[in-house]
């Protein structure tokens, strides 16, 4: 993968004048709100999708989306990424091998107006509900490592701290040390950006785990599995379909991960709780 150009990269938050009403009083004040704009994914000169996203880390977004959607299998399959931002949006110019572009033509559709998508361009139920290769990672972490990663994730969300309007996705090593965090208005986008950042940094995603500040939908579980991340922990609940996918794909799926509490929905062998299942700590 090579980067061709990146122009006018914007901040993830903007200042707006608002009327704030508190304690029976109102005042006009300056406030920070999350930035959101349409981002067009253009492969070999042809537009594939338009996503509503936070205009930060767009190179990571381009790579992570391409990997998690199965458009390419490896980072090196992306030959050029050009990021162009303008007043009303941004475009990601992405070059992929001709055979990949031909396959993409079968999936092409415009997805304008969505804040993230994990099933983009699929035209059949079978294509959406595909089962990715099974994860065979031997990763094991302690519940303390998970709690440590959750604390670190909370502390590394500058846009969320300013605006309260974005999701975050982070990757931690087996000891719970968070290495990378990405934020976005769309939970799928945040995970895509994280996947792209991992690939750009040449970090082996299978040697750690992901934590997200959202629910764990089917699309989130699919993206984690596509990226070979063996454990996905969400602060909210998973869906039934996400659990089914995780169970069949070998993904450890955790929900309601807060402090030292959590619910493990699939493949619990990767999380050392310090007590045997059925015992009281």
UniProtKB/Swiss-Prot annotation:
GO terms for cellular component: cytoplasm. One of its GO terms (biological process) is Mo-molybdopterin cofactor biosynthetic process. It holds the Pfam family FdhD-NarQ. Its main location: cytoplasm. The active site is at residue 117. It is found in: Cytoplasm. Keywords: Cytoplasm, Molybdenum cofactor biosynthesis. GO terms for molecular function: sulfur carrier activity; sulfurtransferase activity. Required for formate dehydrogenase (FDH) activity. Acts as a sulfur carrier protein that transfers sulfur from IscS to the molybdenum cofactor prior to its insertion into FDH. Belongs to the FdhD family. This is Sulfur carrier protein FdhD. The lineage of its organism: Bacteria, Pseudomonadati, Pseudomonadota, Gammaproteobacteria, Lysobacterales. The gene is fdhD.
């Amino acid at each position: 993968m090579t980067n061709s150009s990146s122009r006018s990269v914007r901040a993830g938050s903007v200042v707006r004048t608002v009327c704030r009403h508190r304690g029976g009083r109102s005042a006009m004040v300056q406030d920070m709100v999350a930035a959101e704009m349409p981002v067009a994914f253009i492969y070999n000169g042809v537009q594939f999708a338009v996503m509503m996203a936070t205009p930060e880390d767009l190179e990571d977004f381009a790579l992570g989306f391409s990997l998690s959607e199965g458009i390419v299998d490896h980072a090196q399959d992306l030959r050029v990424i050009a990021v162009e931002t303008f007043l009303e949006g941004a475009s990601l110019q992405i070059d992929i091998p001709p055979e990949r572009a031909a396959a993409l033509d079968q999936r092409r559709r415009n997805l304008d107006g969505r804040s993230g998508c994990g099933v983009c361009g699929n035209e059949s139920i079978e294509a959406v509900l595909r089962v990715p290769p099974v994860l065979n990672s031997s990763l094991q972490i302690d519940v303390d490592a998970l709690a440590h990663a959750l604390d670190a994730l909370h502390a590394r969300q500058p846009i969320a701290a300013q605006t309260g309007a974005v999701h975050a996705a982070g990757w931690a090593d087996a000891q719970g040390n968070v290495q990378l965090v990405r934020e976005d208005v769309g939970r799928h986008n945040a995970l895509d950006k994280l996947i792209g950042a991992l690939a750009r940094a040449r970090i082996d995603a299978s040697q750690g785990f992901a934590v997200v500040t959202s629910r764990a939908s089917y699309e989130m579980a699919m993206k984690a599995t596509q990226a070979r991340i063996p454990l996905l922990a969400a602060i909210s609940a998973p869906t039934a379909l996400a659990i089914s996918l995780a169970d069949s794909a070998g993904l450890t799926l955790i929900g309601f991960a807060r402090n030292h509490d959590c619910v493990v929905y699939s493949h619990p062998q990767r999380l050392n709780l310090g007590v045997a299942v059925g015992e009281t700590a």
